[in-house]
Regions:
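ER/Golgi luminal nucleotide-sugar-dependent glycosyltransferases, focusing on the catalytic module
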Residues: 1-556
Length: 556
């Protein structure tokens, strides 16, 4: 069979994801010719891989004008409609799906043998008050009967370069099926969603809202947005694929991490460190930085902090000359294992950043301090610090092992302190400030700090890290524009760390605080829901009383 594939690619980072290369590797077995149309720039490395590794020599780069439909139009014009008419089928596809999850050859054979079908796709969209019934365009195949008809050329010849994607949806995505039906052709969808129950759906898009149905029906493609748009369901989708499909789910995780962020819910399950190990010897030097703002607190934890093995060197900074003298006396017995520095900066992280010349000689670095973590609550402040320091020390060797053994890991952060998990310490992330600093820093990736329900915070800034993972922070010119208030500065930096590492393609691991069962989270959630219901009930009661009084006054 002479099958042609017009494959449209777009990537805001001008990068071809691993799942796309895998997809093309599987698809090339089915097609006589693949034309790769990119609506974003391609690197020379990616072009070389397409040509040499996959044998795809037909590459068409264009601006993202008119989106997928204009790209397919340009692909047809570039190939020529006469060539299309002489082929047995033309498949239009984009890179918005993972797959193939299951065998695709048998599906082609089934539809090619069915004389009652002229064009077909994976899923259709039922008629609504807003849209006509239509095949979803992420995968559509036209047979020769359609390709030879003048209606096919007429439709594609009038496709415009719309600047608004909604115009593309309104004019082409939702209209092409009806256009070819009116021309006398017949279509089928591998999953005919018209026959499926959709009463509870806000929008009858099964590829997005019903991904479990997609897997149950063994459709070979799963939309990327089915995972990003259903963040707490995504983990179960991955588990189902690992059980029922041979598709390498690592490609999904890599794509989600690279393009959508390091802390999607479906990625968190793999971030806990393994059981704590002891006496791991790193091949490269390790440094623990401690910034001392309160000498009695430092004394309280001194024995624990300096109980680490001989591979650990220490850098202790302090901003007060009198406290420096106290530290010199307290640490004199440790000799050259400890470097003591009088810092010009009082904030713990600024004090560390000032020591760039020392830190860059170490592959792995830890950071903690004695600064106040919870304002005006001494008991809470002590409880949080205790949790954080205990994790930093207990998991020190395991953290260094993860940093050294896993090239992709750049940070190891503490789990949520008990105080946070109990709902007794909450603070809203400084989202506008984070977004502004990110923009000013001119980083590689874009990240939306405004939309996610939560952002990952490194409490206290306590962390083990690779210098290379946070090199951008040490070089960041916009540090001068950071808040002057120490608490505001902490809020910003603690919310930036995992995203700065992610921008440099580093992931993070979590030191578990396992003393709290997950049942506690469920109990807290139920308590919050109950509280919300009570507030709503009180609000409704107050409104009823006001309405009643208003009616009584009117009667007078």
């Amino acid at each position: 069979m002479e099958r042609i594939l017009l494959y449209v690619h777009f990537n805001k980072c001008n990068h071809i994801s691993g799942h796309v290369f895998y997809q093309l590797e599987q698809l090339k077995l089915l097609f006589s010719k693949i034309i790769f149309i990119s609506n974003s720039s391609l690197s020379n490395e990616d072009k070389c891989r397409l040509r040499e590794d996959l044998g795809i020599s037909d590459l068409l780069e264009r601006d993202n004008r008119g989106f997928d439909f204009a790209a397919w139009r340009d692909g047809m014009n570039w190939l020529g409609f006469d060539t299309l008419q002489n082929s047995d089928s033309l498949t239009l596809m984009n890179d918005t799906c993972f797959g193939p999850l299951w065998d695709l050859a048998s599906i082609y054979q089934r539809f090619e043998e069915d004389s009652q079908v002229d064009f077909w796709g994976m899923t259709n969209f039922r008629k609504t008050r807003y849209f006509e019934e239509h095949l979803q365009s992420y995968f559509v195949t036209f047979k020769k009967s359609v390709l030879k008809d003048k209606a096919f050329r007429e439709f594609w010849s009038q496709v415009e370069d719309f600047a608004d994607v909604q115009d593309v949806i309104d004019h082409y995505e939702t209209k092409f099926t009806k256009r070819f039906l009116e021309a006398g052709f017949r279509y089928q969808a591998l999953l005919d969603t018209r026959q499926e129950e959709a009463g509870e759906l806000l929008h009858p898009d099964f590829s997005y809202y019903k991904p479990l149905k997609i897997l149950e029906a063994k459709l070979p493609f799963l939309k990327v947005k089915a995972l990003t748009g259903n963040p707490f369901l995504a983990r179960y989708l991955l588990e189902e694929l690992e059980t029922s499909s041979s598709y390498p789910t690592s490609l999904i995780r890599e794509h989600l991490f690279y393009h959508f962020g390091p802390d999607l819910p479906c990625l968190l399950q793999d971030k806990y460190l393994s059981q704590a190990t002891s006496n791991y010897r790193a091949d490269q030097p390790v440094l623990l930085h401690i910034h001392v703002t309160d000498f009695p607190i430092f004394q309280h934890y001194q024995d624990k902090l300096f109980s680490l093995s001989s591979q650990y060197q220490y850098l202790v900074t302090v901003a007060q000359p009198e406290m420096l003298k106290q530290l010199q006396t307290a640490l004199a017995h440790l000799g050259d294992k400890v470097q003591l520095v009088l810092s010009q900066a009082s904030h713990a992280w600024l004090a560390m950043l000032d020591q760039k010349e020392i830190l860059q000689d170490y592959a792995y670095i830890g950071h903690l301090s004695t600064h106040q973590l919870v304002e005006n609550q001494a008991v809470f402040d002590q409880a949080m610090r205790s949790d954080l320091i205990n994790m930093m020390v207990y998991y020190a060797d395991t953290s260094i092992e993860a940093l050294e053994q896993e090239s992709a890991v750049g940070l190891v952060i503490p789990d949520l302190p008990r105080l946070v998990r109990d709902g007794l310490f909450e603070s809203e992330p400084p989202r506008p400030r984070l977004a502004a600093i990110w923009q000013e820093a001119g980083l590689h990736k874009s990240f939306d700090f405004m939309t996610p329900p939560s952002l990952t915070r490194v409490y206290g800034g306590f962390v083990w890290f690779k210098y290379s993972a946070l090199a951008s922070l040490f070089q960041m010119k916009s540090l001068e524009s950071l808040p002057s208030s120490e608490q505001e500065l902490s809020d910003v930096l603690e919310h930036l760390l995992v995203y700065l590492a992610w921008d440099s393609h580093y992931d993070f691991k979590i030191m578990p605080l396992s003393s709290l069962p997950s049942l506690l989270d469920w109990q807290r959630k139920k308590a919050e829901l109950t509280e919300q219901k009570e507030k709503l009930s009180q609000k409704n009661l107050s409104q009823k009383i006001r309405n009643r009084l208003s009616n009584l006054l009117k009667k007078k």
